[in-house]
C-alpha cells in the first residue's frame, strides 16, 4: 500500500509523484543490474587469476640422471617464476630419436608457447618441426653441430637458443693424465649416431695426443652393440674415456660390468655416466643448466625476449667428482678437491 499524503487534492502532483516513483524504480533496477555485472566480473577475474596462461612442452630424449636433472631444473625455475600460470607437459622419447619427431609435431599441433628440447635428438626434431615456436635446448654440447649451422658464433639467428653441457675437454684430458700418467693408450667409447659425441671425440683427441697418449676410437651405433664394442675397447686400451653421450649413459651398467672384469678404468664426461661406470669426472651440474634454461624461458614468455638473439649459455663452473665404489676396485684414493658422485 502506498500512502499519498499531501497529493490527494490535485491530480497533477499525484501524476508527477508516480513518474518520480517509476524513475526511482528504474534507477534501482539499473543499480542492481550494475552490481550483478560487477560481481560477475570480479568472480571471473578471481577464477582466471590461477588459470593457465602459458603452455610449455618438454621433449626429453631418454630417462637417465643427467637429463632428468636438467628437466627438473627447468621445471623448478619456470614454476618459481610463473607459478600456476604455466602448464608444463613433459614427454619422454625413451631413447628413440624417431619418437622425438612425433613429440615435437604433437607440441606444434597443440600450439604450445615454447618447446624445451632436452638432448640433441630432441632439439633437432623440434627445430625441424617449427620455425615459429621458440625452442630452448639443454644438454646440448655444441649447437652449431646439432643444428648444422655454418660459422656459428653463439647466437643461432633463428627460433632456437638454450644452454650447453660442454665441459672443458682440456680439463678432462688433464684429469685423465693426472690419474693415469703411466697409461699408453686411451680408448674413446661413444655412439657414432650422436653428433655431439663425435664433436667431443675430435676435440679431446688433440688434448690427449698432447699428453703422448695413443688414442683409439671405439664407436657403437646403438645399444645393441655396446657390449661387444666395450669389450674390444677394454682389450685394446689402458684407460677408457666416455664423452657426454646419451646412449652410453643409458648403457652405463652394461659398460661397467665389462670394464670391471677387464680392470680397465673409465674417465667419464659427466657425473651421470661416472655414477654408472666411471672412476672420476670433471663435470657440470645438469640441474643448474636446466634451471638456467628455465630462466631463459621466463624471459621469452613473460618479457618478450627474442629467442633468435639470445646467446647460448654455458655452465659457469665445473666440479671434480669420483665414484668411491669403482675407485676402490682400482685402489685409487682421491683428495678433498673431489666430491663423490650422487
Label each PLM-derived region with a short phrase.
Residues 195-264, 270:
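Pocket-lining segment of extracytoplasmic ligand-binding domains
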Residues 56, 74, 161-209, 306, ...:
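An alpha-beta-alpha
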Residues 55-76, 83, 89-99, 193, ...:
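Extracytoplasmic "Venus flytrap"
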Residues 47-49:
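Bacterial signal peptide processing site
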Residues 273-325:
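Flexible loop/turn connectors
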Residues 41-45:
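C-terminal motif of bacterial Sec signal peptides marking the signal peptidase cleavage site
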Residues 89-151, 245-269:
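Beta-alpha junction/loop-to-helix N-cap segments that form part of ligand/metal-binding clefts
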Residues 143-185, 284-305:
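Hydrophobic alpha-helical segments within soluble ligand-binding/sensing domains
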Amino acid at each position: 500500500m502506498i500512502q499519498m499524503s499531501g497529493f490527494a487534492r490535485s491530480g497533477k502532483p499525484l501524476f508527477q509523484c508516480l513518474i518520480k516513483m517509476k524513475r526511482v524504480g528504474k534507477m534501482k533496477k539499473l543499480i542492481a543490474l550494475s552490481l550483478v555485472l560487477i560481481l560477475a566480473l570480479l568472480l571471473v577475474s578471481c577464477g582466471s587469476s590461477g588459470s593457465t596462461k602459458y603452455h610449455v612442452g618438454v621433449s626429453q630424449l631418454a630417462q637417465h640422471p643427467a637429463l632428468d636433472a636438467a628437466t627438473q631444473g627447468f621445471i623448478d625455475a619456470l614454476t618459481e617464476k610463473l607459478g600456476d600460470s604455466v602448464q608444463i607437459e613433459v614427454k619422454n622419447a625413451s631413447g628413440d630419436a624417431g619418437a622425438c619427431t612425433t613429440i615435437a609435431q604433437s607440441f606444434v599441433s597443440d600450439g604450445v608457447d615454447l618447446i624445451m628440447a632436452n638432448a640433441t635428438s630432441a632439439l633437432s626434431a623440434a627445430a625441424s618441426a617449427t620455425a615459429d615456436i621458440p625452442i630452448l635446448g639443454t644438454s646440448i654440447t655444441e649447437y652449431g653441430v646439432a643444428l648444422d649451422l655454418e660459422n656459428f658464433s653463439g647466437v643461432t639467428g633463428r627460433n632456437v637458443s638454450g644452454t650447453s653441457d660442454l665441459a672443458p675437454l682440456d680439463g678432462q684430458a688433464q684429469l685423465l693424465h693426472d690419474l693415469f700418467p703411466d697409461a699408453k693408450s686411451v680408448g674413446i667409447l661413444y655412439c657414432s649416431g650422436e653428433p655431439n659425441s663425435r664433436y667431443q671425440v675430435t676435440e679431446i683427441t688433440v688434448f690427449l695426443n698432447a699428453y703422448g697418449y695413443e688414442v683409439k676410437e671405439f664407436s657403437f651405433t646403438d645399444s645393441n652393440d655396446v657390449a661387444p664394442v666395450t669389450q674390444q675397447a677394454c682389450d685394446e686400451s689402458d684407460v677408457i674415456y666416455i664423452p657426454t653421450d646419451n646412449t652410453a649413459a643409458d648403457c652405463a651398467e652394461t659398460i661397467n660390468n665389462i670394464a670391471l672384469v677387464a680392470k680397465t678404468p673409465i674417465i667419464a664426461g659427466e657425473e651421470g655416466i661416472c655414477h654408472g661406470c666411471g672412476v672420476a669426472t670433471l663435470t657440470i651440474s645438469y640441474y643448474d643448466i636446466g634451471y638456467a634454461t628455465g630462466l631463459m624461458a621466463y624471459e621469452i614468455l613473460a618479457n618478450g625476449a627474442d629467442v633468435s638473439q639470445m646467446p647460448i649459455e654455458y655452465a659457469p663452473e665445473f666440479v671434480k667428482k669420483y665414484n668411491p665404489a669403482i675407485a676402490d676396485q682400482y685402489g685409487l684414493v682421491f683428495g678433498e678437491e673431489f666430491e663423490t658422485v650422487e
